[in-house]
């Protein structure tokens, strides 16, 4: 597992080779098997392959044109329709009545991370895209208002292999027993 983690990079340039459907299925299966609080599995993943629809998604991602080189986008959506009332000014503090949404976001982020790692294990490149506005992305994909879009993951065969970026040392990010 650590090999995949060390090997994975954010890819922003893909070949025009289509993804083998079996590989895509395995990547999605990894997300399905991700852990979640109380096994709620509060996620939905939208697989976008149609070029016009991908273009519409790219446009609401502040026109990050590099995205169009990926043949597939996987959109990670936290699904809390039955557990949380979504309102403007939603407070995501654990003391708020909507704290379950925060849990759904955390759980969905774990599943999305599994997508990133399994895609790499399948020889595919990915990049996490979180630069968009909820009210713009939802209509493009018909996502109901009571859902929360975490991110878009362009997926494809990498046309580049970027060098490793500097990472903070463990001594800077890990504390034992307390802050």
Model-derived segments and their meaning:
Residues 1-179:
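Acidic, surface-exposed loops and disordered segments
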